[in-house]
């Protein structure tokens, strides 16, 4: 019997992880699984949470998640994994990052220690015995846990990717719907600034919509992105150094754009099916010079369709789940 899929916490538009939640929700429903998405509040006492696969985020989105010994939990960000001691199985979900250290994590993804489960998804089985686990909240000897390393994906399903969108007439403007930060670990203003300056000098209006101040619907973000003359993704210094692969390039490509990135790791993850330049100012000019390279755009869209949707991620997650049966 198929397990039920439970997406837990972060309703759409309320948190970065709400977008991966939405991707999994759509994908598992498409794959024919009974799929539910619950807010992080007291569980519905009339719902049977046994024999489920839970998918969630443990730092701020799992305060009320029901834990039982018949269900498997795929959780990203775990301040204290001992919270899930009563679960049948816990999988620590991580991004494929190098030298990643923050208030929760201190790890470096090493593919040689892992089993590849699908495009951009890797499984590292737990070690036997206790390990030393330390972060800003815990310093203890605890049992190890299985780990799944992933890259995020586009929010479109394969059959929603419309190749005709590459021919759409664009406006002399760019709408960026995301986060531009001038401080903190994810500071990216210093990389955005030279790109925005090139927009201004070349008659391209740059519009920034802060997703936290003015959250937009998925449809609104996709439409604004498609209207933009370029589909751009500029990573913060920390993202470039840790080689994190986020979802924006995959989304932009799937919406019909030439992929543009200042991250070498994202370029490699796309198997070269996008434009890479570490210099954001030059990336603007590279994008403008190639924005109607329809063969390259088509190849990128096909690559994302085959490798970087949540159908891929859901199928890989199921393979990790089956490793524990």
Task: List where the protein language model places each region.
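Short amphipathic alpha-helical segments, especially helix-boundary/capping motifs
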Residues: 259-263, 274-278, 290-294
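Regular secondary-structure segments
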Residues: 236, 284-288
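Short amphipathic alpha-helical surface patches that serve as generic macromolecular interface elements
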Residues: 246-249, 281, 297
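Short coil/turn linker and secondary-structure boundary residues
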Residues: 216, 278-279, 291, 308
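A charged, aromatic-enriched C-terminal amphipathic alpha-helix characteristic of glycosyltransferases
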Residues: 287-323
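Generic signal for short, ordered secondary-structure residues
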Residues: 6-7, 230-232, 283, 296, ...
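Nucleotide-sugar donor-binding catalytic core of glycosyltransferases
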Residues: 2-273, 305, 310-311, 315, ...
């Amino acid at each position: 019997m198929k397990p039920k899929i439970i997406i837990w916490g972060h309703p759409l538009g309320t948190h970065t992880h709400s977008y991966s939640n939405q991707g999994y929700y759509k994908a598992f429903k498409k794959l024919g699984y009974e799929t539910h998405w619950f807010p992080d509040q007291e569980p519905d006492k009339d719902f049977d949470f046994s024999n489920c696969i839970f998918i969630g985020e443990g730092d701020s989105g799992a305060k009320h998640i029901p834990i039982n010994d018949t269900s498997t939990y795929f959780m990203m960000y775990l301040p204290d994994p001992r919270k899930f001691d009563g679960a049948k199985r816990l999988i620590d979900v991580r991004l494929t990052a190098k030298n990643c250290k923050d208030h929760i994590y201190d790890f470096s993804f090493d593919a040689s220690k892992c089993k590849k489960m699908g495009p951009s998804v890797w499984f590292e089985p737990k070690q036997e015995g206790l390990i030393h686990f330390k972060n800003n909240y815990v310093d203890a000897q605890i049992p190890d846990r299985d780990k799944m390393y992933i890259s995020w994906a586009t929010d479109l399903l394969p059959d929603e990717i419309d190749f005709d969108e590459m021919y759409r007439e664009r406006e002399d403007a760019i709408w960026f719907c995301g986060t531009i930060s001038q401080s903190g670990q994810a500071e990216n203003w210093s990389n955005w600034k030279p790109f925005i300056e090139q927009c201004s000098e070349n008659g391209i209006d740059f519009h920034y919509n802060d997703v936290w101040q003015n959250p937009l619907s998925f449809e609104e973000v996709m439409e604004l992105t498609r209207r933009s003359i370029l589909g751009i993704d500029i990573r913060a210094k920390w993202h470039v150094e840790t080689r994190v692969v986020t979802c924006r390039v995959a989304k932009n490509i799937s919406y019909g754009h030439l992929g543009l990135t200042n991250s070498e790791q994202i370029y490699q993850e796309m198997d070269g099916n996008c434009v890479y330049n570490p210099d954001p100012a030059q990336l603007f000019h590279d994008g403008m010079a190639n924005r109607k390279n329809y063969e390259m755009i088509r190849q990128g869209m096909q690559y994302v369709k085959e490798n970087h949707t949540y159908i891929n991620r859901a199928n890989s997650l199921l393979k990790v789940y089956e490793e524990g049966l």
